Swiss-Prot record:
One of its GO terms (biological process) is protein homooligomerization. It comes from Trachypithecus francoisi (Francois' leaf monkey). The keyword Calcium does not apply. GO terms for cellular component: Golgi apparatus; plasma membrane; side of membrane. The gene is PRNP. Residues 52-95 have a biased composition (Gly residues). The lineage of its organism: Eukaryota, Metazoa, Chordata, Craniata, Vertebrata. SUPFAM superfamilies: Prion-like (SSF54098). Sequence repeats lie at residues 51-59, 60-67, 68-75, 76-83, 84-91. Residues 23-230 are annotated as: Interaction with GRB2, ERI3 and SYN1. Cu(2+) 1 binds at residues 61-63. It is a lipid-anchor; GPI-anchor. It is found in: Cell membrane; Golgi apparatus. This is Major prion protein. It comes from the Eukaryota.
């Protein structure tokens, strides 16, 4: 994880360093940049070959070559190249400027990542979250009757679990115990409201199924919590902070 972060940071520094240097390079002069490419050909008073009637060669009204009304090359009314009425590039009259439009708000990547990792918070359950749907595990109960009963009724059992963040528990057993109790309670209440009742066999099987899913949820949440902690430690180290400050200097400067 640390090696990958270092390589990503090095690549980021190299990219922005090149962009920062490009921003500070002066723009070279060229065709139609306003300055003369042949300064020795002009006289102090103006053109070496002054036009008759005030215009240049092929200039009937004082514009440049091919300029009928004093605009630049291909400019019929004095605007920039491709500007028919004097506006900016691609702007017809300059009255529809896009510069004053407010920028759209950006969603914080940190908030998006946190929401995706933590799951959806369930209202009215005191901070419990609902995990993503899982495939119900294949469990053997030790006899043919219960195994067959489970296969025939597994669709009636939960495929999602309720849980709290792993940092609120001291160990896996406490997390799993709380996860099993709240999940079975919520599923039983919801299903009973719909007119369906559970037998003792159903409750026994639900406990086994939900326990396996809660263990899977704990492992998933623990891994995500560890990765978030490692990222915070990496980006809070002094060398990384110094490099980020240098990148900001290049971008702003």
């Amino acid at each position: 994880m640390a090696n990958l972060g270092c390589w990503m940071l090095v690549l980021f520094v190299a990219t922005w360093s090149d962009l920062g240097l490009c921003k500070k390079r002066p723009k070279p002069g060229g065709w139609n940049t306003g300055g003369s490419r042949y300064p020795g050909q002009g006289s102090p008073g103006g053109n070496r070959y002054p036009p008759q009637g005030g215009g240049g060669w092929g200039q009937p009204h004082g514009g440049g070559w091919g300029q009928p009304h004093g605009g630049g090359w291909g400019q019929p009314h004095g605007g920039g190249w491709g500007q028919p009425h004097g506006g900016g590039w691609g702007q017809g009259g300059g009255t529809h400027s896009q510069w004053n439009k407010p920028s759209k708000p950006k969603t914080s990547m940190k908030h998006m990542a946190g929401a995706a990792a933590a799951g959806a918070v369930v209202g009215g359950l005191g901070g419990y979250m609902l995990g993503s749907a899982m495939s119900r595990p294949l469990i053997h109960f030790g006899n043919d009757y219960e195994d067959r009963y489970y296969r025939e009724n597994m669709y009636r059992y939960p495929n999602q679990v309720y849980y709290r963040p792993v940092d609120q528990y001291s160990n896996q057993n406490n997390f799993v115990h709380d996860c099993v109790n709240i999940t079975i309670k919520q599923h039983t209440v919801t299903t009973t409201t719909k007119g369906e009742n559970f037998t003792e066999t159903d409750v026994k099987m639900m406990e086994r199924v939900v326990e396996q899913m809660c263990i899977t949820q704990y492992e998933k949440e623990s891994q995500a919590y560890y990765q978030r902690g490692s990222s915070m430690v990496f980006f809070s180290s002094p060398p990384v902070i110094l490099l980020i400050s240098f990148l900001i200097f290049l971008i702003v400067g």
